[in-house]
Amino acid sequence: MTSDDKPATHLFDQKRATYYEDRIRQVVPGYDALHDLSLLMFNREIGNAGHFLIAGCGSGSELSSLSRQSPDRTFNAFDPSSDMIDMARARVETENISNSIVFSTGTIDNILSNQKFDAATLMLVLHFIVDDESTKGKTHLLRGISDRLKPGAPLIFAEALADRATPHFDSDMNLWRQHLLLKGMNPTDEAKGFKKIVSQMALINEDRLNELLKQSGFTPAQNFYRAHMIHGWITRKV
């Protein structure tokens, strides 16, 4: 059940949800494989139970995947976008997910710091967070997640990694653009949207990623997935 007894189906726009699900698969190579492997990693790490923190829950893909095999898993899911929370709630209802789920519209600061979770996810979020020490920065988010995990608890996250200073950055970006078109994105949408998306991404390299994890109380990241620039990682609370 969700934290809101009010039915979410009236909020569920099937066309909008389908558009989002199609678009994310165009943008992220191997999107479904990423979630399948994340599920298997969690099964290996903590078994079929546990209390999960879903940071930046989006349309609810992680909730759908992680609840699939076990009704004993419970979740706290947050996202700063109320539209995404609405979509996630609707997905939970339409898929008849019976796990206990608490939704929050907001940031990591809306999750009580005295809660201690068995595991967390941060999927395709970090590359949109600025790399600074502000409350809107990567470090603040990672520290906030770390503070709410039990010692040794795993965090599985995925993000685009790249170094804008490398000579092959532009060719990597072009390959990504070609993938969007190959997967059926309208050329007009691609031309208008791609440059905007890339300009909004606070891309970092792997060295900087591990530096941020260390500062935030995590172990060095172990890579378990890669499709072009999209990487899947597991790290653990120290």
PLM feature spans:
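Core SAM-dependent methyltransferase catalytic element
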Residues: 216-238
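Class I SAM-dependent methyltransferase SAM/SAH-binding core
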Residues: 51-55, 59-110
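Short glycine-dipeptide loop
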Residues: 149-155
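C-terminal alpha-helical "lid/dimerization" subdomain adjacent to the S-adenosyl-L-methionine
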Residues: 158-216
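A short, conserved alpha-helix within the catalytic core of class I
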Residues: 129-144
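N-terminal, positively charged/glycine-rich alpha-helical extensions of SAM-dependent methyltransferases
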Residues: 1-19, 176
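A conserved beta-strand element that flanks and buttresses the S-adenosyl-L-methionine
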Residues: 121
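Conserved alpha-helix/loop element of class I SAM-dependent methyltransferases that forms part
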Residues: 30-49
